């Protein structure tokens, strides 16, 4: 059996676990469905259900993706935190269009989100920064994220430096570290089904109103 034949068997084996879909109406909003699906993912025992792919694109049109952790969400959008000097932050500053993807294989579900980003407030970034464990706070100061290491022990030396510097008192919130809020204008909920006749629920924002429809798989 080839690798692709094995993968096909695994895919077929998992087709019986699809969960029911919500009924759509003109009043249905994507944040309602996201909240329910995220709760389902949490209850399923999936490791890090808050993990999501963030795809950005630079000014030359070159896309890049990476996994980050969702830290907050509401009707306004989806929030994650990072170093503002990282590659993704530079790309988001150049081009504020972004895509997110949640993939929960155990549930045969994925959520695809398209939107634009904006920085969260300094206070919101500082509040979250100070909620992190102390090691992560110091590590944010030590890491020049996405920059080349000059030698193997450089990061260890920088970590040691900041551990000494902030050995007493509160670790200050660095200005180069904070949150991005993804403000969605399109959200698609995908649910796997037998015979690859998958369900696709699509929401598109029209002004302040969310319009919904279903798509062919």
Swiss-Prot record:
Entry's cofactor comment: Binds 1 FMN per subunit.
Biological process annotations from GO: pyridoxine biosynthetic process
EC number(s) from the headed UniProt entry: 1.4.3.5
Xref: Pfam families: PNP_phzG_C, PNPOx_N
Residues that bind FMN: 66-71, 81-82, 87-88, 110, 145-146, 190, 200
Cofactor(s) listed: FMN
Pathway: Cofactor metabolism; pyridoxal 5'-phosphate salvage; pyridoxal 5'-phosphate from pyridoxamine 5'-phosphate: step 1/1; Cofactor metabolism; pyridoxal 5'-phosphate salvage; pyridoxal 5'-phosphate from pyridoxine 5'-phosphate: step 1/1
Catalysis performed (reactions): pyridoxamine 5'-phosphate + O2 + H2O = pyridoxal 5'-phosphate + H2O2 + NH4(+); pyridoxine 5'-phosphate + O2 = pyridoxal 5'-phosphate + H2O2
Positions that bind substrate: 71, 128, 132, 136, 196-198
Entry keywords, A to Z: Flavoprotein, FMN, Oxidoreductase, Pyridoxine biosynthesis
Its job: Catalyzes the oxidation of either pyridoxine 5'-phosphate (PNP) or pyridoxamine 5'-phosphate (PMP) into pyridoxal 5'-phosphate (PLP).
Name used for this protein in its record: Pyridoxine/pyridoxamine 5'-phosphate oxidase
Native source species: Colwellia psychrerythraea (strain 34H / ATCC BAA-681) (Vibrio psychroerythus)
Gene: pdxH
